[in-house]
């Protein structure tokens, strides 16, 4: 797609704004007493847990479609501050779209939508909400800047600028693994991504 149509900032939710992986422990600690994100989430879809502790992995999969769990997820540190700064910086440049993926619709969709509406209110940024439902997250064609924790989604995107938020499941990947772009970055947090975006000369 021509660059003239690529104006949006697209922001993922789980692993970027919402701390999902860091909140499994209470649900599986009876099966994996020493569970930590750092020790056990070694790759996408938790291959170590899936192989060695299938019952724990099944519980985690159930959490992915649990409305109460989805709504209860805490925001990472400085998400509100980052969203406020991004909203001010980008308001005359294009649309901010928060694009999330769920495996199910219905109540879990409503929970995620409510979570995002509250983020809108807290940050006072009227971002667009886009929720993909199904096996895979859809790829948006108007994205100029993509902020994600999924290497696969970054590779699929034609975004000009790509930001991988470092999480335990993507610890083995670098900027070179994110697919074609004008520039790619690996950063520690959404807030750090916002600071970098503000330094880009568009």
Whereabouts are the PLM-identified features?
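Active-site neighborhood of HAD-like aspartate-dependent phosphohydrolases
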Residues: 2-59
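Short catalytic/ligand-binding loop motif for oxyanion handling, primarily in non-cytosolic enzymes
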Residues: 18-21, 25-26, 94-96, 105-111, ...
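Metal-dependent phosphoesterase signature
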Residues: 34, 43-84, 88
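Substrate-recognition element of Asp-dependent hydrolases with the DxDx(T/V) motif
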Residues: 70-75, 79-112
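Substrate-recognition "cap/lid" segment bordering the active-site pocket of phosphatases
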Residues: 99-147, 151-155
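Short acidic-hydrophobic, aromatic-tinged amphipathic segments that line or gate anion-handling sites
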Residues: 129-134, 180-193
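Short amphipathic alpha-helix with an adjacent loop that forms part of the alpha/beta core around
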Residues: 138-140, 192-202
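Acidic, Mg2+-coordinating phosphoryl-transfer loop and its flanking beta/alpha structural elements
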Residues: 145-185
């Amino acid at each position: 797609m021509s660059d003239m149509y690529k104006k949006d900032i697209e922001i993922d939710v789980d692993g970027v704004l919402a701390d999902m992986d860091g909140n499994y422990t209470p649900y599986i600690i009876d099966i994996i007493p020493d569970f930590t994100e750092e020790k056990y989430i070694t790759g996408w879809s938790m291959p170590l847990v899936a192989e060695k502790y299938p019952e724990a992995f099944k519980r985690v999969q159930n959490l992915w479609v649990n409305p109460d769990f989805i709504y209860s997820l805490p925001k990472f540190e400085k998400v509100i501050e980052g969203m406020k700064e991004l909203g001010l910086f980008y308001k005359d440049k294009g649309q901010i779209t928060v694009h999330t993926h769920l495996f199910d619709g219905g109540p879990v969709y409503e929970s995620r939508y409510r979570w995002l509406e509250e983020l809108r209110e807290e940050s006072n940024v009227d971002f667009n909400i886009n929720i993909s439902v199904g096996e895979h997250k859809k790829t948006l064609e108007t994205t100029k800047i993509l902020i994600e924790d999924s290497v696969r989604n970054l590779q699929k995107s034609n975004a000009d600028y790509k930001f991988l938020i470092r999480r335990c499941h993507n610890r083995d990947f670098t900027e070179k693994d994110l697919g074609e772009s004008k520039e790619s970055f690996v950063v520690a947090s959404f807030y750090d991504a916002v600071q970098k975006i503000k330094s880009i000369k568009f």
